[in-house]
Amino acid sequence: MSDSDKTAARVAPKYVPISSFVESSFFTKLSELKLNEFKLDSSKRDIHGFITSPRRLNKFNDQPTLNLDLQSFDIAEKEANNLHISGELYNVNTIEEFKNINKSDLLNDWGKEVYTRLIQTESLDYKAFNWFFILTFSDLKKYKFYYWVAFPTLNAPWFVTSTRDDSLVEKHTKNITRLLENDGDSENLAFSQLYQVVGESYLDLNSIRSSRNGVFVFLDGCLNKETKPSVQLKNYLYFLAYKGFEDVDVIVYRNDGSSFQVHYELDTDSFNKNVQPKITGWERTSQGKLGPKLADLGSLINPHQLADQAVDLNLKLMKWRIAPELNLDIVKEQRVLLLGAGTLGSYVARALMGWGVRKITFVDNGRISYSNPVRQPLFSFKDCFSDNGQGEMKAARAAEALKEIFPGVSSEGISLEVPMIGHPVSDEAKSKSNFGTLSQLFDDHDIIYLLMDSRESRWLPTVLGYAKNKIVINAALGFDSYLVMRHGNLSQPEESRLGCYYCNDVVAPNDSLTDRTLDQMCTVTRPGVALMASALAVELLVSILQHPDGSKAAQDESTKFGGVPHQIRGFLHNFQQTKLYAPNYKHCSACSHTVISKFEEEGWEFVKKCLNDSGYLEEICGLKQVQEEAEKATEDLMKDMDLDDEDSEWLD
């Protein structure tokens, strides 16, 4: 170096700051991990980003840009031809924690990690010099993500001489290009020492040749018009100062041919390798101010996708702290058939959606009347006079209403009259078709809810539920009382098999609708009863599904999510609720082995006989014999009493 070079003025070096570009896919993945995996754990997570090596200057690459996307969470996923940077994610749990955390101390802690890693390395390993950290808070309800990226930078007192010598660039650029192309991995050669042996140029990153000066090549990630290198160079310069270099030439290599050389001199008087250097590195905003950024994805994500994620949000939050072992997937996967689209059907459907159930089918043959909307939340006033003043069909309208509430639900409404025992068949073709449709619906669904108005309408679904081994839940209302129960399963031990809706009856169900006054035909109940019964019916299902035995669970067994009772009876007049157990009855008109076997043998023919004559069913299941034995026992009791004429008058 000439004397004029040695005495040239020294100026403080300038660098192009690094910025970040965080794609929406990064936050989408972060929200998924936060909800399902991280939960309340705010431990630091390893991630990675990348910087491209552009070949043409444009407004997007005039400064080095760290890119973060979906693949940043997969350490193994790395694209070729990019400079990959390792990093750490620190996702806090509250916005207050994000705001109040001491950013200076946090950057210092991160900088110490880089400093420790740097002074312990003996090579120019790219990963030791380039690290980033990102502090985040995820507002999963509003899809807002607060974040601040830091690139910890170690500062050493290097100065740039006012003299430039581009002869190094002209002399070595072609050789550097060839070496980079032959290496095929620009990441490994991001910073390397240039040396020559017999006129040939070599790049070495495995060791630093002992010297007070040297020539190094820095592969720059930006194409800024000014002759300023990226700020990433500062950590390499600190490393050289730590290793004893006082005078270095750096060739800042760029892909577009605009490479340049900078000569650096160390102020040895102010550099102390035994003292941790000043650490900087928080990214500035586009206005040049220090501060975090906000990514609001609410306006970018498809509303249907937003709704789908939001439906599951509160459910998954249960697993964070309250019920970590709750199996939500098994609930979500259930295909549910609701027999009845009235008051109970409406409330049960809403509660099922709240639990994330996506497949719900309604069966009902009624139309919406003016008295319905106030008690049945899936209907509105306009539904009462639609379809030429007849009112909408309940099943179809209920299915539409669910889709209006949540477009991601698969909901269907089927207008169907369920064949009822005690109501003789008047049109066999139609009744048989209805039976076939109902039977197919049972095959296509996992869960059956019996929510109809009349007692006899539940008989055939009860038989089908046992024959097809389905989970059947029954909900029935009185004026100020309710019953919620689950039916048993034929695979349960007979001595402990749960009873069904009809197991306490000594007569077969019959016509309860004919010759009834208005107050007897309408469901006259206190309005709150339906909500209570519906909620319990859905919560009972969830408890059943959490039990390893499912519908085979014995009465009142418990799971990690609570009990699994057989029956729940509630009474509003004294605001009491009772759990009951009723074993199966061997002569039950719906679930006895005799009835189920006969149904499996004859199918529709058996059903038709029962519909036309409930007495036939009583003979098949044995209730007729029970009734006869009871009558005979009564007669025998009367004979044994041997009343005289004076005592017999009170029997009249």
From Swiss-Prot:
Positions occupied by motif GXGXXG motif: 340-345
Active site annotation, chain numbering: C522
InterPro entries, per the entry: Atg7, Atg7_N, Atg7_N_1, Atg7_N_2, ThiF/MoeB/HesA, ThiF_NAD_FAD-bd, Ubiquitin-activating_enz
Annotated keywords: Autophagy, Cytoplasm, Protein transport, Transport, Ubl conjugation pathway
GO cellular component assignments: cytosol; extrinsic component of phagophore assembly site membrane
Cellular localization per UniProt: Cytoplasm; Preautophagosomal structure
NCBIfam families referenced in this protein's UniProt entry, alphabetically: E1_like_apg7 (TIGR01381)
Stated name of the protein: Ubiquitin-like modifier-activating enzyme ATG7
Lineage: Eukaryota, Fungi, Dikarya, Ascomycota, Saccharomycotina
